[in-house]
């Protein structure tokens, strides 16, 4: 009798999480494998979908984050269905976190690849990446959506070399009644002039950012990266469009492509559809030319992981020996920091979306986050630490801080007079109370009497602010439980 060998049926590809999966606990549906890094609003993990065996990325967002912005990001991803845009599969509420399940891009971002290899890209590589990126932008712009944060760190590659747009934390929707948006948002060095000037902008603002990204891929960093971002903010609208530092290194086609992107007048700037017909893009080679650089970057990453794991194992060995030598009858309790087996993350602290993201730029260049420049990477590249903060360009924070300082200084120099209202007196934030020595006892007593009502007023304002943030979260959780709202 002939033996028939049964083959396991092929697992289907995950397209979207079904209703049954969404009603389960996420741990029943996924196995979380490792942390990838920190993205806009939350931590990102690599996980496997148990039913299909497909690798996914899960962004875990604390509900105390700006829920409205998170829901907007989910909404935009949910509406998109393009091979050039990172896919959204579904989301869960788990304790105090929102789990957002997205497509996993194993090669990371273009900026990761540049940093890991410590090399910029060739024209052929740039053309291939730009072609896919333009197809993604053409799709978004057709849907009347503006990405608003195009840069190498938000262009992800899968292991086959296909580029996909990611991180829609700052994306915007254009409606029929809103021809242009006026919100200042984005990453300073990549911002279009009209965005900085707040004169209204539309989809072609992304094209300017793409031109800056092309220079970033070619030179390792965008124009003005070596100067303070505050100065760059004023230079971008007033100076001529930026160009390559060494134009002679690049072909006429590539130079012209960048020139078409970096037209200061939005009305005269090329669209994504037009740029797809540009000779530089039309001559782009297939994604296979990206495989070598992807493999090289992944090899570097793997070696770093192995090195980190060896260091962890060595630390644990040393800690274990110290514990054994401590006492003949009692072993020292291992605390939170000593002897703990730390999982060697595949990426360092500065990851964005679902990829490692140590940008090449200094200081506060955050889009959805506020960045710091505490540590330096190899060469000219610096690490960017991302924390979950609402979207606010750093140059706006600079102005706000200056305004606060001016208020404090003017108060310290003012002559004390009758206190008309408790709100007239603001406590200096820098703790400098030297000016009080020049006040009379009567003035000091008036200020002292004003403290109690001022404190009650501040407490009430804080309570109202807390309630305004808390209620939408409670409403969203309740809606999720009733399954009336599926992200």
Curated annotation (Swiss-Prot):
Positions carrying Phosphothreonine: 3, 183, 340, 367, 387
Phosphoserine PTM sites in chain numbering: 265, 320, 410, 414
EC number: 2.7.11.1
Primary location class: cytoplasm
Basic and acidic residues bias: start-end ranges: 303-312
Positions of post-translational N-acetylmethionine modification: 1
Biased composition, class Acidic residues, residue ranges: 313-326
Residue ranges of every copy of the SARAH domain listed in the record: 433-480
Pfam families from the UniProt entry: Mst1_SARAH, Pkinase
Keyword RNA-binding: no
Region (Disordered): 303-332
GO biological process, one term: hippo signaling
Class of this enzyme: transferase
Keyword RNA-binding: no
Assembly mode: Homodimer; mediated via the coiled-coil region. Interacts with NORE1, which inhibits autoactivation. Interacts with and stabilizes SAV1. Interacts with RASSF1. Interacts with FOXO3. Interacts with RASSF2 (via SARAH domain). Interacts with AR, PKB/AKT1, TNNI3 and SIRT1. Interacts with DLG5 (via PDZ domain 3). Interacts with MARK3 and SCRIB in the presence of DLG5.
PANTHER family: STERILE20-LIKE KINASE, ISOFORM B (PTHR48012:SF2), STERILE20-LIKE KINASE, ISOFORM B-RELATED (PTHR48012)
Family: Belongs to the protein kinase superfamily. STE Ser/Thr protein kinase family. STE20 subfamily.
Functional note: Stress-activated, pro-apoptotic kinase which, following caspase-cleavage, enters the nucleus and induces chromatin condensation followed by internucleosomal DNA fragmentation. Key component of the Hippo signaling pathway which plays a pivotal role in organ size control and tumor suppression by restricting proliferation and promoting apoptosis.
Protein name (database record): Serine/threonine-protein kinase 4
Organism: Macaca mulatta
Gene that this polypeptide is encoded by: STK4
């Amino acid at each position: 009798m002939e033996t028939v060998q049964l083959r396991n049926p092929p697992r289907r590809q995950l397209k979207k999480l079904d209703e049954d999966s969404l009603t389960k606990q996420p741990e029943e549906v996924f196995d979380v494998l490792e942390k990838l890094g920190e993205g806009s609003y939350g931590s990102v993990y690599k996980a496997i979908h148990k039913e299909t065996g497909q690798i996914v990325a899960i962004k875990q967002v604390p509900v105390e984050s700006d829920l409205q912005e998170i829901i907007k990001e989910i909404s935009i991803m949910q509406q998109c269905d393009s091979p050039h845009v990172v896919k959204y599969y579904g989301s869960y509420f788990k304790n105090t976190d929102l789990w957002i399940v997205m497509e996993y891009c194993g090669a990371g971002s273009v900026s990761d690849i540049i940093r890991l290899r410590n090399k910029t890209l060739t024209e052929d590589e740039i053309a291939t990446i730009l072609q896919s990126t333009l197809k993604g932008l053409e799709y978004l712009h057709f849907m009347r959506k503006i990405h608003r944060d195009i840069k190498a760190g938000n262009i992800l590659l899968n292991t086959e070399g296909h580029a996909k747009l990611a991180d829609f934390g700052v994306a915007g929707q254009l409606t029929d009644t809103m021809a242009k948006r006026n919100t200042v948002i984005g990453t300073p060095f990549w911002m279009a002039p009209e965005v900085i000037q707040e004169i209204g902008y539309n989809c072609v603002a992304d094209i300017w950012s793409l031109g800056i990204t092309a220079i970033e891929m070619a030179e390792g960093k965008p124009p003005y990266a070596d100067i303070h971002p505050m100065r760059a903010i004023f230079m971008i609208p007033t100076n001529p469009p930026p160009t390559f530092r060494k134009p002679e290194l690049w072909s006429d086609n590539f130079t012209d492509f960048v020139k078409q992107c970096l037209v200061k007048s939005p009305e005269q700037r090329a669209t994504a559809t037009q740029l797809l017909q540009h000779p530089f893009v039309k001559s782009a080679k297939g994604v296979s030319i990206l495989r070598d650089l992807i493999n090289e970057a992944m090899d570097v990453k793997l070696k770093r992981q192995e090195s980190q794991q060896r260091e962890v194992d060595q630390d644990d060995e040393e800690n274990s020996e110290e514990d054994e030598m401590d006492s003949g009858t009692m072993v020292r309790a291992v605390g939170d920091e000593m002897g703990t087996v730390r999982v060697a993350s595949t990426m360092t602290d500065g990851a964005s979306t679902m990829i490692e993201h140590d940008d090449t730029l200094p200081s506060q260049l955050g889009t959805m986050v506020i960045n710091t420049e505490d540590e330096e990477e190899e060469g000219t590249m610096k690490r960017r630490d991302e924390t979950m903060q609402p979207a606010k360009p750093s140059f706006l924070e600079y102005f706000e801080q200056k305004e606060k300082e001016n208020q404090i200084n003017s108060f310290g120099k003012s002559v004390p007079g009758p206190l008309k209202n408790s709100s007239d007196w603001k406590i200096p934030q820098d703790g400098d109370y030297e000016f009080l020595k020049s006040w009379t006892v009567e003035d000091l007593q008036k200020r002292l009497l004003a403290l109690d009502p001022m404190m009650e007023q501040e407490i009430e304002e804080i309570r109202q602010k807390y309630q305004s943030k808390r209620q939408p979260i409670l409403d969203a959780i309740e809606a999720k439980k009733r399954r009336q709202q599926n992200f």
